[in-house]
């Protein structure tokens, strides 16, 4: 990890800008300002902005940031933010998992989950794709999501056995390998594939990989408009990220060499036709597979540094908006890229950390030897 030194002058500059940025949750586009800042300065600017404003963000966003910062740094102060996430998802798992045997519950809650997809172009495409699989959203984006996160923290959640039984009885393969589904949300599907294997309810990896490659053959890249090209690249990064337990473990590059080779060959189009979060993930894909010296990493870093706006102390959205709630994802990714550690940290296993152990929700039970278990 870089040794990040800050002069007093820089610190006061950042602090002053942070105080200004605390009111910057702009809904209107902001004009980005050019700069000559270093990677270190960009890293600290984003960090100061996010951590100053963290408690104004939704619990889900606080948890997302804290989990990733713990896995990058191992600093236990980030365990408290992760605890906020656990408290939230444990209550939700209790509601969903403990009602699975209630007549009509799966059908009604699945419909609610689908309705939340929205009515924009992407939401409509996803609703159309998921129509043949009416219960898939509940199984995947609710049950698998919450159970896998509880598991990552070293616990089993409420009504665990009923949830596992329900998911084992649900054949997710048709939805996961459907071409329209992959075209609608490739990255999310590989997440579901990983989570299903993680909690022991099904191994869909090879089937999904084959379906993904058939959906996006490299020979037909020239036929992909920007939206579909972004979806392809985003999906490819998540093959690697899911294999890492989402930044908990280094990844053997051999299984994913087909992805790394593709990124290296197509980096110029990736930099042109995708967005900052996807571009940053491409760079991280090389770092997490031990390929930090690959020229792609330097290209991505230069792009990300140039995308930083010093006035708002963040990387703006593709539409130029400075909303921290929706922009935390791309900005914490930028932090990770610019200060990648020598060692990744598992968990956090909240039952093993003094500051969180005494505040755990009663709804979860510690797993045996969680800290000694590789979840995948």
Residue ranges and their predicted role:
Residues 122-280, 287-290, 298-305:
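Eukaryote-skewed repeat-based solenoidal scaffolds used as protein-protein interaction platforms
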Residues 2-13:
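Bacterial N-terminal signal peptides that target proteins for export
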Residues 26-119, 132-152, 162-172, 294-376:
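Terminal, non-catalytic domain-edge segments
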């Amino acid at each position: 990890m870089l040794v990040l030194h800050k002069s007093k002058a820089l610190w006061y500059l950042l602090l002053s800008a942070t105080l200004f940025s605390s009111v910057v949750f702009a809904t209107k586009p902001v004009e980005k300002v050019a700069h000559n800042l270093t990677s270190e300065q960009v890293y600290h600017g984003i960090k100061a902005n996010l951590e100053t404003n963290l408690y104004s963000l939704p619990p889900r966003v606080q948890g997302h940031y804290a989990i990733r910062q713990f896995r990058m740094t191992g600093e236990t102060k980030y365990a408290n933010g992760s605890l906020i996430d656990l408290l939230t998802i444990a209550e939700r798992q209790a509601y969903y998992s403990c009602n699975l045997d209630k007549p009509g519950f799966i059908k009604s809650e699945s419909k609610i989950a689908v309705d939340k997809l929205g009515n924009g172009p992407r939401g409509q495409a996803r609703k159309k794709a998921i129509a043949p699989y009416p219960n898939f959203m509940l199984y995947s984006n609710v049950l698998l999501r919450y159970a896998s996160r509880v598991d990552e923290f070293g616990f089993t959640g409420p009504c665990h056995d009923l949830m596992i039984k329900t998911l084992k009885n649900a054949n997710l393969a048709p939805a996961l390998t459907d071409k329209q589904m992959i075209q609608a949300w490739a990255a999310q599907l590989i997440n579901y594939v990983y989570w299903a294997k993680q909690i022991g309810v099904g191994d869909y990896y090879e089937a999904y990989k084959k379906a993904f490659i058939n959906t996006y053959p490299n020979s037909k890249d020239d036929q992909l408009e920007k939206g579909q090209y972004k979806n392809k690249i985003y999906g490819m990064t998540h093959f690697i990220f899911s294999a890492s337990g989402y930044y908990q473990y280094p990844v053997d590059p051999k299984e994913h060499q087909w992805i790394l080779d593709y990124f290296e060959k197509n980096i110029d189009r990736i930099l042109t036709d995708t967005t900052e979060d996807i571009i940053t993930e491409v760079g991280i894909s090389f770092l997490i597979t031990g390929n930090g010296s690959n020229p792609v990493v330097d290209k991505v870093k230069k792009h990300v540094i140039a995308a930083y706006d010093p006035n708002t102390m963040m990387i703006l959205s593709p539409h130029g908006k400075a909303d921290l709630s929706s922009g935390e994802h791309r900005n914490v990714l930028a932090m990770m890229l610019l200060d990648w550690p020598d060692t990744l940290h598992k968990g956090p296993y909240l039952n093993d950390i003094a500051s969180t152990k005494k505040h755990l929700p009663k709804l979860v039970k510690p797993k045996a030897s969680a800290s000694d278990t590789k979840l995948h």
